[in-house]
Design a protein with these regions (language model features):
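Conserved SAM-binding strand-loop segment of SAM-dependent methyltransferases
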Residues: 72-88, 280
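Extended interfacial segments that mediate partner engagement and assembly in macromolecular machines
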Residues: 1-69, 142, 147, 152, ...
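A short glycine-rich, Lys/Arg-flanked "PGG" loop and its adjoining helix->strand segment in the class I
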Residues: 112-127
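A conserved beta-strand element that flanks and buttresses the S-adenosyl-L-methionine
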Residues: 100
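Conserved S-adenosyl-L-methionine
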Residues: 168-179
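Conserved beta-strand signature within the Rossmann-like core of class I S-adenosyl-L-methionine
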Residues: 125-133, 318-324
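Hydrophobic, well-ordered beta-alpha structural blocks that scaffold small-molecule cofactor pockets
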Residues: 26-27, 33, 49, 188-331
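Short, glycine-/aromatic-enriched active-site segment of Class I SAM-dependent methyltransferases
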Residues: 130-152, 156-158
Length: 331
């Protein structure tokens, strides 16, 4: 089943590690309690940040290949989060002061039931933090997160309607810079609901703007394909950095290929990207290049970190960035 053997490891990037520490600061604004549950805790990196701040840490994640790592310093159940799995926590009702779900909500086929399970394990004075990673998707012409693992996308208004049906309240909506800009919805069991003061952020989502967004996406894909194909036809080496799901989505939608892709995660090395069959190699491969190369940061939300890593290995580089528009950036 999906996510049982999961190759995405959140602790791979320094950008995320720093953000996880910052996220603890966000949580601390709302909660004095110190018992936290991380839903879809992956390798436990976010829980590490909570543990450093004195929290009692719990997690749940179905990835069997990551369980030894995530449970090393935390109480982690290897399972999907649902009404059956929460029974595995002792005294699960009203147990946790903090419940977090970062970039997992879109994976769920039953979001109302997901929230209702969160409500069961959340303490009466606690807060639930739902992070979604598409806050600037339309304004920045981002379409690389639209793929089979992401079942739904929520505006502030649609999230408000869903939250109400689950018997919860929106206390705050925070925009953070991570993953190309994300929303963090701060929810609780008690009112009042403060969502109305944030609804103006949805003003961009008009039918006209959405049609323009679709045209922009098609244009970016075509322009990127044209640039890369032209460079490769001239004999240049064009590689990708980051064998991320969003990068693979962009490649397959845009219909281009690359000489190879490098990734920081050893679990992906010497595999191939789905559909395009591009080899995935260790980052050190870049050191072996003896001529000018072009690098496409496929985890574009980590552009600055990727640029710094590549520059430390090879300075004879031009970067091809595609959001919000296509541009070539010299090292």
């Amino acid at each position: 089943m999906l996510f049982k053997n999961y190759l995405y490891v959140s602790g791979t990037t320094q950008t995320l590690k720093q953000y996880f520490k910052d996220f603890v600061d966000i949580v601390a604004r709302y909660n004095s309690g110190k018992k936290v549950l991380d839903i879809a805790c992956n390798d436990g990196t976010q829980l590490d940040a909570f543990k450093e701040r004195g929290y009692e840490t719990y997690g749940i994640d179905p990835a069997e290949n990551l369980h030894a790592l995530s449970s090393k310093n935390h109480n982690v159940i290897c399972d999907y989060f649902n009404e059956n799995s929460i029974l595995k926590f002792d005294d699960y009702r009203d147990k946790f002061d903090v419940v977090i779900a970062e970039n997992v909500f879109a994976h769920n086929s039953y979001p109302k039931e997901f929230l209702e399970c969160c409500k069961k394990v959340l303490s009466h004075t606690g807060h639930l933090f739902i992070q979604t990673s598409q806050a600037e998707m339309v304004s920045e012409n981002q379409f690389d997160t639209i793929y089979h693992e992401h079942i739904s996308f929520f505006s502030i208004n649609s999230m408000r309607n869903l939250v109400r049906r689950a018997g919860l309240y929106i206390k705050d909506v925070i925009k953070t810079p991570v993953h190309g800009s994300s929303f963090v919805f701060v929810l609780s069991k008690w009112g009042p609901d403060n969502s109305s003061q944030f609804l103006s952020r949805d003003n961009l989502l008009t039918p006209f703007r959405m049609k323009q967004y679709a045209l922009n996406c098609i244009g970016i894909a075509a322009e990127t394909r044209g640039v890369i194909n032209a460079l490769r036809q001239l004999g240049h080496t064009v590689i990708g950095y980051g064998a991320a799901a969003k990068g693979n989505t962009f490649i397959n939608f845009s219909k281009f290929s690359l000489d190879y892709i490098v990734d920081d995660n050893p679990l992906k090395h010497y595999l191939y990207t789905p559909g395009s069959r591009i080899p995935i190699l260790p980052p050190e491969t870049i050191k072996k290049e003896r001529k000018h190369i072009y690098v496409v940061p496929l985890a574009c939300n980590f552009f600055d970190e990727i640029k710094n890593k590549v520059s430390s290995m090879n300075k004879d580089v031009t970067y091809i960035k595609y959001f919000p528009t296509v541009e070539l950036i010299n090292a």
